[in-house]
A protein has these predicted regions:
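Extracellular glycan-modifying ectodomains
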Residues: 1-195
Length: 195
């Protein structure tokens, strides 16, 4: 198991689903702090919106639960909360702390950050990567960062390819969300960057 103590980057999940945080936090012990995109569903467009607008509209306007597939879900414009009861004030406060921690980490200049995202099979969110990079550079100009973007997209159209050396885009050969695949991919990306 790799540990954050032996690695020079802060590793941070930016969604799109719970498995990314589960791999980084539980299976690899790479992230000891909770951040806002851990254990929620989020669109990449939403991540970009939240970064650009200080997390405006992160929570559903009216936190009314929907009971579906054995889960109590809260639907926002760019988010779905499956594991958190947003009707509980302490849960909302915990997310607000995560947001402050996340923004504070991005504003510091000390540690580089590796953002990790997994994207679903139905459309190619990777085409939004240039906008994400632009927003990060605009809002946090001193931040040194990389992005590992793992996509389950299986469409026939041309796949996104980045020319930015700090952006790693990997199209996975399956629609299945498999944590073991993430474990391997994250391990490969950080393997050569130990402190």
């Amino acid at each position: 198991m790799m540990n954050i103590e032996t690695h020079n980057e802060k590793i941070v999940s930016i969604g799109g689903w719970c498995g990314v945080a589960a791999v980084l936090r539980k299976k690899m012990a790479l992230c000891q702090e909770a951040f806002p995109f851990d254990y929620i569903l989020s669109s990449f467009e939403g991540v970009i919106h939240f970064l650009r607008n200080d997390f405006d509209a992160f929570f559903p306007e009216k936190p009314v639960p929907c009971f579906e597939d054995g889960f109590t879900k809260f639907f926002g414009r760019h988010t779905i909360f499956l594991h958190h009861d947003l009707q509980e004030p302490e849960v909302v406060e915990a997310f607000k702390r995560r947001i402050r921690r996340f923004l504070s980490m991005l504003a510091q200049e000390k540690s580089p950050v590796l953002f990790v995202r997994a994207s679903g099979p139905y459309f190619d969110e990777a085409h939004n990567i240039p906008e994400f990079v632009s927003v990060i550079r605009e809002r946090f100009p001193a931040l040194k960062f990389r992005l590992l973007f793992m996509s389950h997209y299986q469409g026939e159209d041309e796949k996104f390819q980045s020319t930015d050396e700090n952006v790693i885009v990997q199209y996975l050969g399956t629609e299945e969300f498999r944590e073991d695949e993430y474990l391997t991919r994250v391990g490969e990306v950080i393997g050569g960057n130990r402190g």
